[in-house]
């Protein structure tokens, strides 16, 4: 658990009246504010480096962190293979045919023939 403190007594004058977050599980102290140039904001040190101190606790609201690592992306095109193949052969019949490619909406007829073949190949598979 993280505890917020204001140091009220210390033999090190740079620590007096400074504010810290103490993480006893990690044995770390993070400087929030201190006078002088000895301790910088966000500097992390071992709690033991603070030495003998007296402090008063300061209320701290710790918001839970959400870590997003990776993720999944799904593009959905609701149509049949035959429709796209016919659009390749007869583009004039499908001037408004719009598909999703990498999150973007694009007119199928604006793609190059190679891109059209790639979309058909990647969109329609026998199994996952």
Curated annotation (Swiss-Prot):
Superkingdom of origin: Bacteria
The Glycine radical domain, residue ranges: 5-128
Pfam family, one: Gly_radical
GO molecular function: formate C-acetyltransferase activity
Cellular component GO terms, alphabetical: cytosol
SUPFAM superfamilies, alphabetized: PFL-like glycyl radical enzymes
InterPro entries registered for this protein in UniProt: Auton_GlycylRad_Cofactor, Form_AcTrfase_GR_CS, Gly_radical, Glycyl_radical_cofactor_GrcA
Keyword Membrane found: no
Presence of the UniProt keyword Transcription in the record: no
PTM annotation (Glycine radical): residues: 103
Keywords, sorted A to Z: Organic radical
PANTHER family in the record: FORMATE ACETYLTRANSFERASE, FORMATE ACETYLTRANSFERASE 1
Task performed by this protein: Acts as a radical domain for damaged PFL and possibly other radical proteins.
Name under which the protein is recorded: Autonomous glycyl radical cofactor
Origin organism lineage: Bacteria, Pseudomonadati, Pseudomonadota, Gammaproteobacteria, Pasteurellales
């Amino acid at each position: 658990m993280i505890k917020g403190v204001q140091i009220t007594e210390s033999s090190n004058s740079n620590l007096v009246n400074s504010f810290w977050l103490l993480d006893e599980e990690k044995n770390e102290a993070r400087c929030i504010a201190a006078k002088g140039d000895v301790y910088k904001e966000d500097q992390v040190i071992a709690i033991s480096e603070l030495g003998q101190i007296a402090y008063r606790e300061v209320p701290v609201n710790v918001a839970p962190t959400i870590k997003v690592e990776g993720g999944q992306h799904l593009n959905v095109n609701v149509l049949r293979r035959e429709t796209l193949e016919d659009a390749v052969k007869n583009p004039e019949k499908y001037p408004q045919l719009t598909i999703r490619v990498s999150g973007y909406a694009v007119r199928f007829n604006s793609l190059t023939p190679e891109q059209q073949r790639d979309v058909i190949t990647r969109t329609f598979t026998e199994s996952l």
